[in-house]
């Protein structure tokens, strides 16, 4: 790990844009890398070496890093309620990873989080999800939760899944995630309560008409239930 940290520290970051459509660059500096080396010297386990990330005002992060658990250089998409790996960037060595970032970093971030419709598949479009009028059943704010992802701007993940809706409290990691999985051709939801995931079957649906019905009936009560919890 010492060699990996030193190699990352020596990288040329000058080509990275400071801003990409509302996302600001944050680069690991010498102090950050020194802190990682000190932790290793103290016998601590270091599982990730952050290299740089882009972050917007919603707390969405596009992160380039080394992941010791899989022994790969990779890109993690880190959102307030969920995270996943962009496997298209995974490389086993730093040189090819860095060259891949130079070629596709801006495009990768743009397609993933800024213009996510670029990642919509044929199935996602054929189901009519991007053009569906969700305004009645998915209001911008509900029970103190803010909708910051909607079906017209769904985030493509892995294994055929899209995040088509997210409601969250802006100051805490609680809320609701609405998914569409194109392999199973179904909609379903997960809850987050203080970062802990929970399955909720009230929003299970096979098509947009069914989804509209269950959202109309259950979305408000589900979010109210999260508000009413007492630890």
Give the ranges of each region predicted by the language model.
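Long, compositionally biased interface segments
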Residues: 202-231
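Intrinsically disordered, low-complexity regulatory segments enriched in Ser/Thr/Pro
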Residues: 57-100, 170-213
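Negatively charged, low-complexity tracts enriched in Asp/Glu with abundant Ser/Thr
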Residues: 1-53, 107-172
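Polar/charged alpha-helical tracts
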Residues: 34-38, 96-99, 140, 144, ...
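Short, structured interface segments
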Residues: 94-112
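Short, isolated positions within intrinsically disordered regulatory regions of eukaryotic proteins
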Residues: 19, 64-66, 102, 136
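Glycine-rich loops and low-complexity Gly/Arg-rich segments
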Residues: 100-101, 113-115, 189-190, 214-216, ...
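Short C-terminal domain-edge/linker segments immediately following a structured domain
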Residues: 105-108, 119-121, 195-196, 220-224
């Amino acid at each position: 790990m010492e060699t990996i940290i030193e190699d990352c520290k020596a990288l040329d970051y000058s080509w990275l844009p400071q801003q990409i459509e509302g996302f600001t660059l944050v680069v690991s500096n010498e102090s950050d890398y020194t802190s990682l080396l000190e932790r290793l010297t103290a016998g601590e386990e270091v599982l990730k070496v952050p290299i740089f990330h882009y972050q917007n005002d919603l707390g969405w992060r596009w992160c380039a890093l080394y992941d010791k658990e899989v022994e790969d250089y990779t890109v993690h998409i880190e959102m307030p309620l969920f995270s996943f790996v962009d496997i298209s960037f995974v490389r086993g060595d730093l040189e090819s990873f860095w060259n891949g970032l130079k070629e596709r970093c801006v495009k990768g971030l743009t397609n993933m989080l800024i213009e996510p419709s670029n990642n919509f598949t044929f199935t996602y479009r054929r189901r009519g999800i991007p053009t569906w009028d969700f305004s009645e059943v998915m209001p911008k704010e509900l029970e103190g939760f803010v909708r910051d992802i909607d079906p017209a701007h769904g985030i493509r993940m892995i294994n055929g899944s899209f995040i088509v809706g997210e409601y969250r409290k802006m100051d805490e990691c609680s809320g609701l995630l609405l998914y569409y999985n194109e392999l199973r051709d179904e909609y379903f939801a997960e809850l987050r309560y203080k970062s802990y995931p929970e399955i909720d079957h009230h929003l299970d649906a096979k098509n947009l008409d069914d989804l509209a019905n269950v959202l109309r009936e259950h979305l408000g009560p589900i979010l109210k239930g999260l508000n009413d919890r007492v630890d």
